[in-house]
């Protein structure tokens, strides 16, 4: 009985930790339990004495602080990692949303499902159906990329006329003031037609002068610039990146010095600016330049510190000394992007966004707005491109035949095709969910990094898969190619707004560990403020949090989550339970990693990356489940849901295993392995059988396939190869049963080629009627158009004569 009572006590302790019962209530329960065991004669009643001696200091604050919290506080202050001003501003900026629940070990799934699904307003829907549809019709991506290296003038004029650059600008200034969800849908539709078109529209609606002015501009700046930006009268760009400082914005060498100078014939207080920027989208054609630089005030003309820090200013590009106009050439996707320079350019102090009072506040301004832009533009562009590619590749896989069968029926093709379909579904879910948060007023900095990384990364992988499937069709550039420019340009999205390697290895968990953790940020603030009282309360909440996640990790691992609560009892029930387990695992691993590695965790980037991977996969899986719920839990969509969640579970568990295999403290790693994997690993990647179901969805018209491609531009036209493939798929499917009937009548397995000749012969023999013959003829036209590629006169490929150096010309002439 003694052994059973000890086991029961251990179970009771575990239950108290599991359910996160408060320290005081837990102490009372333990005392009552021990007293009950004493009365029952199982334990000596004297056990209450040492137990009370142990519990009293924990529950009596003065004793607890002096005996426990104060020594821990002193040690914590010593090991707390140093934080630069830019790091602190990045962490302080923005808010925590759903990722906070995932990080804390006990997600509230009902809260997730209660977030309202965004809807387009009548005005937003009309814009998508009207101006966006027309802009897609006007865009000829081959002309844009190969012949003009720019949007045609009439398309530029159309975008300005219909205020495409003003989606984020408020109506009081003449803007459209669209929701984040509407912006995402616009960009997805545009990106399915032309990456350059989507980038050109997306950048002014992301982080730039318009966004910064609305949040921080003076009334005079807003009244002057915002109506002009809304009309397209001003073209903005924002220059942050320097040759010497790419992702490390805090190290920009560009400078500004506060001084007196001449401006329009008068002596005024201003700044003398010197900068050298590159990779700046819209810089070659910009009329107003947003500029980030480090401002100093050596003469203290502003009355404050000498070193003011990063500052943002708005400068007309007609200002003497401003250099723009030259272009970079990014991977044959020639959107307007280039360098800008200036040396000792004098501008008035009022050019600072927000006026002189905002001097030195530039980095805070940027990071507070960056999460919104990063969370919408890049994920939407990648997602829209993949959605269109998914439909087109699925159609092509059905239309293209080898060995007398559609290549889409071959298992070797099914594997990458399933990844494309699954990623399209997951990416759209992830890109949509973050817009929910933004529309609720959140600025989810960590989520924006997650969505930026995973949408662009999965987008690139999907494009590579599509290229493998389409083969020669994908390689040959021309009007009929729907893939090659996306393939060439995929690294652009990977690189910009925080290169993906940096985002994964430093930003996601680097910010998430502090921003999303329920106690760490407040503990750091308490340590910084030397507030031992606040630290004491946080410390014991933190200890309870760690204990809870340790117990939850072990128990949920032992039971594979079967005992945890879920919001539903259908086919997705087990997924919520698995995610409950992984959330507890992440919380435990995060706390142990921070405790064991301390400040060195910042330098252990691969450990940080794997912790970020776990958080990311939890978000992606929850986004899939949220999408499935929002769309009415259509059972036909379950193969995509299964694929998306199973892939996320597998990758999250793989990241945990890799982390433990490489954790520097092997003893701690061994103990964690027992707690997290008490019965070993369990999650498998999507099976071949599931891949078959998912790949099949893309190859025939159906409601699930339509939901994958929702909102994309699918009108068949000369310049829309995706729309033409959609039309061809319908034509070929209509011809299939007629072809099979002819084969049966003739007793032959005829190839699905030369359908026009087959139609003629079958009509003559009376095997089909005229309508059926017309279907076969149309299918053959569509089939050939789909599988053929473009060819050119040699002179067409050299759009401009090459200017050779004089010496080379002389040699050739000789």
From Swiss-Prot:
Active site: residue positions: 497 (proton acceptor)
InterPro entries with a match to the protein in the record: Acyl-CoA_dehydrogenase, Acyl-CoA_Oxase/DH_mid-dom, Acyl-CoA_Oxase/DH_mid-dom_sf, AcylCo_DH-like_C, AcylCo_DH/oxidase_C, AcylCoA_DH/ox_N, AcylCoA_DH/ox_N_sf, AcylCoA_DH/oxidase_NM_dom_sf
Involved pathway(s): Lipid metabolism; fatty acid beta-oxidation
Reaction catalysis annotation: a medium-chain 2,3-saturated fatty acyl-CoA + oxidized [electron-transfer flavoprotein] + H(+) = a medium-chain (2E)-enoyl-CoA + reduced [electron-transfer flavoprotein]; a long-chain 2,3-saturated fatty acyl-CoA + oxidized [electron-transfer flavoprotein] + H(+) = a long-chain (2E)-enoyl-CoA + reduced [electron-transfer flavoprotein]
EC number: 1.3.8.7, 1.3.8.8
Superkingdom of origin: Bacteria
GO cellular component: cytoplasm
The keyword Lipid metabolism belongs to this UniProt entry's keyword annotation: yes
Region forming the signal peptide: none
One of the protein's GO biological processes: fatty acid beta-oxidation using acyl-CoA dehydrogenase
Keyword Cytoplasm among record annotations: no
Induction field: Transcription of fadE is negatively regulated by FadR. Induced in the presence of fatty acids, in a FadR-dependent manner.
Matches recorded under Pfam families: ACDH_C, Acyl-CoA_dh_1, Acyl-CoA_dh_M, Acyl-CoA_dh_N
GO molecular function ontology, one term from the record: medium-chain fatty acyl-CoA dehydrogenase activity
Cofactors named for this entry: FAD
Enzyme class: oxidoreductase
Alphabetically ordered keywords of this record: FAD, Fatty acid metabolism, Flavoprotein, Lipid metabolism, Oxidoreductase
Changes seen on gene knockout: Cells lacking this gene are unable to grow on octanoate, decanoate, dodecanoate, or oleate as the sole carbon and energy source, but grow well on acetate, while the wild-type strain can grow on acetate, dodecanoate, and oleate.
Family statement drawn from the similarity comment of this UniProt entry: Belongs to the acyl-CoA dehydrogenase family.
Function: Catalyzes the dehydrogenation of acyl-coenzymes A (acyl-CoAs) to 2-enoyl-CoAs, the first step of the beta-oxidation cycle of fatty acid degradation. Is required for E.coli to utilize dodecanoate or oleate as the sole carbon and energy source for growth.
This protein's name: Acyl-coenzyme A dehydrogenase
Organism: Escherichia coli (strain K12)
The encoding gene: fadE
């Amino acid at each position: 009985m003694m052994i059973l009572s000890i086991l029961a006590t251990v179970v009771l302790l575990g239950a108290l930790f599991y359910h996160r019962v408060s320290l005081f209530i837990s102490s009372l329960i333990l005392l009552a339990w021990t007293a009950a065991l004493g009365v029952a004669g199982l334990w000596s009643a004297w056990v209450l004495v040492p137990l009370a001696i142990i519990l009293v200091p924990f529950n009596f604050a003065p004793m607890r602080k002096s005996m426990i919290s104060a020594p821990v506080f002193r040690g914590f202050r010593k090991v707390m990692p140093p934080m630069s001003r830019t790091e602190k501003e990045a962490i302080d900026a923005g808010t925590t949303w759903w990722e906070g629940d995932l990080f804390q070990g006990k997600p509230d799934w009902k809260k997730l499902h209660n977030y309202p699904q965004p809807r387009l307003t009548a005005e937003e829907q009309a814009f998508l159906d009207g101006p966006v549809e027309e802009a897609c019709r006007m865009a000829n991506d081959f002309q844009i990329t190969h012949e003009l290296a720019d949007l045609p003038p009439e398309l530029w004029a159309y975008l300005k006329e219909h205020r495409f650059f003003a989606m984020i600008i408020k109506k009081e200034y003449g803007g459209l003031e669209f929701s984040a969800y509407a912006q995402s849908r616009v960009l997805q539709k545009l990106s399915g037609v032309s990456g350059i078109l989507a980038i050109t529209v997306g950048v002014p609606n992301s982080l730039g002068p318009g966004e910064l002015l609305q949040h921080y501009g003076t009334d005079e700046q807003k009244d002057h610039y915002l109506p002009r930006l809304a009309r397209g009268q001003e073209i903005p760009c924002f220059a942050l990146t320097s040759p010497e400082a790419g992702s490390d914005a805090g190290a920009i060498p560009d400078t500004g010095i506060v001084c007196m100078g001449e401006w329009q014939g008068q002596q005024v207080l201003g700044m003398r600016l010197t900068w050298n920027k590159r990779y700046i989208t819209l810089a070659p054609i910009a009329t107003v330049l947003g500029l980030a630089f480090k401002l100093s005030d050596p003469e203290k003309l502003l009355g404050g510190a000498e070193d003011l820090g990063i500052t943002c200013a708005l400068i007309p590009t007609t200002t003497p000394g401003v250099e723009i106009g030259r272009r970079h050439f990014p991977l044959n996707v020639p959107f307007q992007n280039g360098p800008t320079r200036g040396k000792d350019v004098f501008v008035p102090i009022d050019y600072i966004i927000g006026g002189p009072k905002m001097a030195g506040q530039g980095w805070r301004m940027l990071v507070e707005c960056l999460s919104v832009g990063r969370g919408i533009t890049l994920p939407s562009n990648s997602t829209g491109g993949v959605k269109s590619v998914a439909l087109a590749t699925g159609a092509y896989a059905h239309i293209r035949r080898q060995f007398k069968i559609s290549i889409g029926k071959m298992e070797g093709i099914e594997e990458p095709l399933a990844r494309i379909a699954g990623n399209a579904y997951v990416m759209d879910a992830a890109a949509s969910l973050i817009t929910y948060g933004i529309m609720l007023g959140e600025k989810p900095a960590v989520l924006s990094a997650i969505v930026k990384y995973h949408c662009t990364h999965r987008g690139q992988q999907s494009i590579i898969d599509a290229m493998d499937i389409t083969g020669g069709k994908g390689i040959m550039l021309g009007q009929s190619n729907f893939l090659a420019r996306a393939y060439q340009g995929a690294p652009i999205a990977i690189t910009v707004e925080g290169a993906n390697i940096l985002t994964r290895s430093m930003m996601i968990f680097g910010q998430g560990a502090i921003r999303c953790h329920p106690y760490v940020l407040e503990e750091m603030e308490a340590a910084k403020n030397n507030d031992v009282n606040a630290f004491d309360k946080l410390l014991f909440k933190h200890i309870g949090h760690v204990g809870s996640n340790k117990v939850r990790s072990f128990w949920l691992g032992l039971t594979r989550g079967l005992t945890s609560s879920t919001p539903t009892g259908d086919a997705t029930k087990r997924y919520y339970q698995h995610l409950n387990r992984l959330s507890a695992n992440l919380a435990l691993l995060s706390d142990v990693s921070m405790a064991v590695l301390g400040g060195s965790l910042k330098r252990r980037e691969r450990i940080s990356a794997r912790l970020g991977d776990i958080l990311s996969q939890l978000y992606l899986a929850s986004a899939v489940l949220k999408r499935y719920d929002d769309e009415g839990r259509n059972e036909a969509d379950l193969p995509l849901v299964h694929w998306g969640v199973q892939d996320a579970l597998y990758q999250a568990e793989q990241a945990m295993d890799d982390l433990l295999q490489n954790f520097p403290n092997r003893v701690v790693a061994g103990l964690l392995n027992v707690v997290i994997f008490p019965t070993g690993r369990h999650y498998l990647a999507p099976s071949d059988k599931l891949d078959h179901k998912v790949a099949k969805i893309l190859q025939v018209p159906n409601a699930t396939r339509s939901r994958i491609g929702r909102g994309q531009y699918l009108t068949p036209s000369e310049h829309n190869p995706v729309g033409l493939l959609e039309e061809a798929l319908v034509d070929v499917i209509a011809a299939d049963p007629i072809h099979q009937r002819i084969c049966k009548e003739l007793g032959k397995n005829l190839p699905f080629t030369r359908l026009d000749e087959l139609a003629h012969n079958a009509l003559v023999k009376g095997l089909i009627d005229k309508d059926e013959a017309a279907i076969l003829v149309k299918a053959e036209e569509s089939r050939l158009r789909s599988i053929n590629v473009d060819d050119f006169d040699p002179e067409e490929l050299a759009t401009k004569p090459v200017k050779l150096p004089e010496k080379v010309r002389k040699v050739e002439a000789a």
